[in-house]
């Protein structure tokens, strides 16, 4: 694969309800299902990713815009429990996200060069957005 080639792009809704509906072990509440069409879409994406040669998965979630600027994860691992402030009874999810910090730093630098307000998040206690957690859990 040539260096720097984008091999796939997708736009994926990522409400935390999707994870809740799957009843994964790491989510505390349980559900009786729901959101099937969206869950099937994520399952299809996961199958597609298994057929593609790629080095990194980049997730951009617009929810981070509610903070100031665009944030990039700047530690090798973010591991915690996410309790969503809007849906605390639905989304209490234990996550463990691995980060390619070098790639994240380069993306942050390039975005900044193009006039985007950016920040590297190097605080281990930073609350990772549920859009990222939802997307990572399915891919």
Language model features: what each stretch is:
Residues 2-110, 114-120:
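A short aromatic-anchored loop/beta-hairpin motif
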Residues 12, 133-134:
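N-terminal accessory/precursor segments of enzymes
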Residues 139:
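Conserved small/polar residues in nucleotide/adenosyl-binding loops
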């Amino acid at each position: 694969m040539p260096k720097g080639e984008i091999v796939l792009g997708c736009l994926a809704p990522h409400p935390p309800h999707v994870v809740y509906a799957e009843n994964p072990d790491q989510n505390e509440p349980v559900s009786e299902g729901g959101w099937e069409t969206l869950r099937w879409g994520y399952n299809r994406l996961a199958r597609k990713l298994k057929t593609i040669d790629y080095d990194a998965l980049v997730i951009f979630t617009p929810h981070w815009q509610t903070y100031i600027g665009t944030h990039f994860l700047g530690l090798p691992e973010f591991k915690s429990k996410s309790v969503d402030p809007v849906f605390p009874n639905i989304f209490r999810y234990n996550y463990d996200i691995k980060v390619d910090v070098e790639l994240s730093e380069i993306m942050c630098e390039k975005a900044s060069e193009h006039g985007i307000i950016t920040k590297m998040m190097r605080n281990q206690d930073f609350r990772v957005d549920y859009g990222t957690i939802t997307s990572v859990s399915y891919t």
